[in-house]
């Protein structure tokens, strides 16, 4: 299983958001959960003047958390990533995350 990091594109494989994809905003390693952009939104009620970011208060919609076991890393073409390693591509100077996919059976 590929390690999930902030900024990765993931697909939800279980739960009420199953089949949807999004970008990881935060990884909560201690809790075993991730926050995915625009998925599992929760409503928070905030009093007026409690936050500099939202001085008017009101009802905020924030991304909730999803169990890390319920998401899977997908590549740029929306296909699942099977193996991943850190290394250099041919001719590249910087290290990057290289992804390998399972070969298609014929």
UniProtKB/Swiss-Prot annotation:
Q: Which UniProt keywords apply?
A: Ribonucleoprotein, Ribosomal protein, RNA-binding, rRNA-binding
Write down the Gene3D superfamilies for this protein, in alphabetical order.
2.30.30.30
InterPro entries, from UniProt? KOW, Rib_uL2_dom2, Ribosomal_uL24, Ribosomal_uL24_CS, Ribosomal_uL24_KOW, Translation_prot_SH3-like_sf
Q: Name one GO molecular function term.
A: structural constituent of ribosome
Note whether Signal occurs among the keywords. no
Q: Which SUPFAM superfamilies match?
A: Translation proteins SH3-like domain (SSF50104)
Q: Which PANTHER family match?
A: MITOCHONDRIAL RIBOSOMAL PROTEIN L24 (PTHR12903)
Q: What does this protein do?
A: One of two assembly initiator proteins, it binds directly to the 5'-end of the 23S rRNA, where it nucleates assembly of the 50S subunit. One of the proteins that surrounds the polypeptide exit tunnel on the outside of the subunit.
**Which protein family is it in?**
Belongs to the universal ribosomal protein uL24 family.
Protein name (database record)? Large ribosomal subunit protein uL24
Taxonomic source organism: Anaeromyxobacter dehalogenans (strain 2CP-C)
